[in-house]
């Protein structure tokens, strides 16, 4: 069941990839993918290339995939282990969602952080109180870690 669904999503992704994103299996393992997300142009992550690891559970799509950043990123909703605080990867997951929608949600999280549900409270605090310092720090991390 899971592998059929994952194959279908892979075909759909290859046919109609979400903008600024790509994803596919690592080697022969259909349950482990790597995705690439380009930093959204209107964000401090612009120009960066962010690698994201996706692990599908055996009961996918009834359980959400485990998605984490491999590239270091300065963001209130993404911690130093690469964990992402995103409702659709937790309690708001639905079998109707796809990896394509997950990647788009992560892109929009890069553009519009959610400082009211932070994974890294000190970055959220800076985002709320000193936006320009947040943006310059995020930009310098992007240059340091996400640009080849």
UniProtKB/Swiss-Prot annotation:
Looking up SMART domains in the UniProt record yields: UBCc (SM00212)
Which residues does the UniProt record annotate as the domain UBC core? Answer: 1-147
Coiled-coil stretches, from where to where? none
Q: Name one GO molecular function term.
A: ubiquitin-protein transferase activity
Catalytic reactions of this protein: S-ubiquitinyl-[E1 ubiquitin-activating enzyme]-L-cysteine + [E2 ubiquitin-conjugating enzyme]-L-cysteine = [E1 ubiquitin-activating enzyme]-L-cysteine + S-ubiquitinyl-[E2 ubiquitin-conjugating enzyme]-L-cysteine
| Signal sequence, start to end | none
Task: Quote the Gene3D superfamilies the UniProt record gives.
Answer: Ubiquitin Conjugating Enzyme (3.10.110.10)
What keywords tag this UniProt record?
Answer: ATP-binding, Nucleotide-binding, Transferase, Ubl conjugation pathway
Active-site residue list: 85 (glycyl thioester intermediate)
One Gene Ontology term of the biological-process aspect is: ubiquitin-dependent protein catabolic process
Q: In which pathway does it act?
A: Protein modification; protein ubiquitination
Which domain of life does the UniProt lineage start with? Eukaryota
Q: What is said about its interaction partners and assembly?
A: Interacts with the E3 ubiquitin-protein ligases MBR1 and MBR2.
Family (UniProt):
Belongs to the ubiquitin-conjugating enzyme family.
What this protein is reported to do is described as: Accepts the ubiquitin from the E1 complex and catalyzes its covalent attachment to other proteins. Mediates the selective degradation of short-lived and abnormal proteins.
Q: What is this protein called?
A: Ubiquitin-conjugating enzyme E2 11
């Amino acid at each position: 069941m899971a592998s059929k669904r994952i194959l279908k999503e892979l075909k759909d992704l290859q046919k109609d990839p979400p903008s600024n994103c790509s994803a596919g299996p690592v080697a022969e393992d259909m349950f482990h993918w790597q995705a690439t997300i380009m930093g959204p142009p209107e964000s401090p992550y612009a120009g960066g290339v962010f690698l994201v690891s996706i692990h599908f559970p055996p009961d996918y799509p009834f359980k959400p995939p485990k998605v984490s950043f491999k590239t270091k990123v300065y963001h209130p909703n993404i911690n130093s282990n690469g964990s992402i605080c995103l409702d659709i990867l937790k309690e708001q997951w639905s079998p109707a969602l796809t990896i394509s929608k997950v990647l788009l949600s992560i892109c929009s999280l890069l553009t519009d952080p959610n400082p009211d549900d932070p994974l890294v409270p000190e970055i959220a605090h800076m985002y709320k109180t000193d936006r320009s310092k947040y943006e310059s720090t995020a930009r310098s991390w992007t240059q340091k870690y996400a640009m080849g």
